C-alpha cells in the first residue's frame, strides 16, 4: 500500500548524478560513456544501480522491517552528506563530487555483490559542471520521503518484527539440531 507507493515515488537521484551534468559540459565527461569494449554508458550504469536500489528496498521490506529501516537510514545519510557538500559549494571555486558514496560501506553481502556503490567511487563529477540546484531539489524530495518511511516503521523494533523473529527461531533450531 502506502509504503510501496512511497518507495516507488523515490527518484533515488543520489545514484544518477550524471543525469544532472550540464549539456555544455557533457563533452568533458564523454569518456565516461566509452570505457574500452564496454558499451554500457555511465548513465546506463547509474540507472541500473537506481533500479537495483529500488528493488533492494522492496526486498528489504519483505525480508524484515529492521533490515528495511537500516537500508533507509544508510540512504538517508548518503543523501544528507551529499546535500551538505552541495550546501557548502561555492560556484566560484572548484569542488568535485568525490566518492559521494564512499562512506556508505555498511551494506550487506547482497548489496556488495551488486556493487551498488561503484558510481561514486569510480566517477568524479565537478559540481560546477552540474545543474546542482535541480539535483539538490530532487535529493531533498527523496530525503523527505525517506524520513517519512523511517517514521512509518520506527515503532517496529526487532523484537516486534515477526519475520525477523521467525528467522531467528529457525536459526536457533538449526543450531540446536544441525541435521535437518
Where are each of the predicted segments found?
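Helicase motor interdomain insertion/brace
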Residues: 1-180
Amino acid at each position: 500500500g502506502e509504503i510501496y507507493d512511497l518507495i516507488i515515488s523515490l527518484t533515488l537521484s543520489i545514484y544518477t548524478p550524471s543525469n544532472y551534468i550540464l549539456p555544455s559540459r557533457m563533452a568533458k565527461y564523454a569518456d565516461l560513456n566509452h570505457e574500452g569494449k564496454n558499451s554500457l554508458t555511465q548513465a546506463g550504469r547509474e540507472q541500473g544501480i537506481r533500479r537495483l536500489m529500488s528493488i533492494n528496498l522492496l526486498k528489504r521490506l519483505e525480508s524484515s522491517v529492521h533490515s528495511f529501516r537500516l537500508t533507509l537510514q544508510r540512504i538517508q545519510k548518503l543523501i544528507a552528506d551529499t546535500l551538505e557538500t552541495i550546501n557548502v559549494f561555492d560556484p566560484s571555486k572548484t569542488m568535485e563530487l568525490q566518492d559521494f558514496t564512499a562512506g556508505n560501506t555498511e551494506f550487506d553481502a547482497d548489496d556488495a555483490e551488486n556493487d551498488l556503490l561503484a558510481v561514486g567511487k569510480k566517477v568524479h563529477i565537478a559540481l560546477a559542471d552540474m545543474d546542482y540546484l535541480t539535483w539538490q531539489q530532487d535529493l531533498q524530495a527523496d530525503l523527505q520521503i525517506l524520513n517519512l518511511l523511517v517514521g512509518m516503521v520506527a515503532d517496529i523494533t526487532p523484537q516486534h518484527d515477526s519475520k525477523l523473529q521467525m528467522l531467528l527461531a529457525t536459526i536457533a533450531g538449526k543450531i540446536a539440531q544441525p541435521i535437518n
